[in-house]
């Protein structure tokens, strides 16, 4: 998407009273400018539309989520697998807009249902409180009462 054109069009439409849900790439500056002109929903891509590549830059997408906690974020484009949809939810995004993944699936109805089920499972797992990510190994088993321990 054209950043300048999208920002300019969004600003004009917002002034006319429209609610604008702009499609963007994963550039945080682009997102920030859209928010500055008044957009309440931003729809960054996971990867270029129709490619099915998934989330090619998870760090950028996470930074967008972390930077704009009060903005509704809907990932739009690039989803190709059910696991991609789960990643989006795990990043804290509010939703997913997908078309190509369903429309081009061999069994679209089955794929759509699978995405729905996976997203519900990802949401449920987040509510269950997954463990924190650590850069070092942390055993979860006690050594108390184990043979050969000093």
Task: Map each language-model feature to its residues.
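Alpha/beta enzyme core
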Residues: 1-150
